[in-house]
Amino acid sequence: MKHVVLATTVALTATTTLAHADDWTAYTYSSVSTTAAVKGMTRIADRVATETNGDLNITLHLGKTLQIASADITQAVGDGIVEFAADFFFSGNVPIARILNLPMLIENDAQWAKAYAAIEPTLVEAFADQNVVLLGGYRYPEQTIFTTFPVTSLSDLEGHKIRVTSPEQGKFIEEFGGAPITLSGSEVPTSLERGVIEGVLTASAGGAKNWHEFLPYDYRFAVNYGNSMIIANADAFDALSAETQEKLRSIVAEEGAATTADFIEDEKVQMASQEKAGMTITASNATEVAMATETLAPYWESWAEQNGPEYVEALKVVRDAIGK
């Protein structure tokens, strides 16, 4: 009888332990396993499993491996289709977050850090409205101008078709006479080959890492920064123990910062590699940067006013933070 009781106790203990283990499905927009973005998400999944002693296990799926469009990732997380994700294309679901991507508003790493810290509480609330917990994120290097034609100043964009990833980038291209076109990353190579587009706004360590063979010119004019949000389904997150929640937040914060640092370092490596392979790289000049900033500043205001008082206040918060 004693053996039966003991066996029953062990079985119940095992069942209880299993009941507390959570298995999450994760998704990232990136389909390239060697990028800093995917490596960072992989480290998060590995560390979470180890540091929670298996209480939380995250299985990462790369872009295009699940039936989730890039623009729908935040919605998919909010709906519980996946529990965890990295989303670069969040702006359609959380448009106020686009404030960080306004052209010429944030010009360097220090300004980015100040702006993000100031606006983070607003972003947390905005994602919460989508049933999503904003845990952190990472940033790409500055988005510069890669083209199939020579560019040494912004005036050279006139009449050319440039791929952008947001309406805000599109406004920049329009301001200097170009035609902005929105395409998914998978469409870029064939579109460049066929002349559907003649350039892209991206980073050397971003899109240009895969598309450099089609883009012989890079004008190092920093239009804006691109960033990815690391998010979780609110219901799934709330179901975790307080200890696991804190551990997940801590790991995301550390690996998000590490991913940003990896991108910055890789930007230097890729620039050198691309130049060695024959890409013509032209530096921007301070006079043109000042001109573009002055030209785009009224757009920041109109963008905020068109979207409502909350956006006007958010813009003020960011501008006050960076002194601009």
What are these regions (language model features)?
Residues 1-6:
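Bacterial N-terminal signal peptides that target proteins for export
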Residues 113-125:
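Signature of the catalytic double-stranded beta-helix
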Residues 22-111, 127-324:
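N-terminal secretory/targeting leader peptides
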Residues 7-15:
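Bacterial N-terminal signal peptides
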Residues 15-21:
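Sec/Tat signal peptide C-region and signal peptidase I cleavage site
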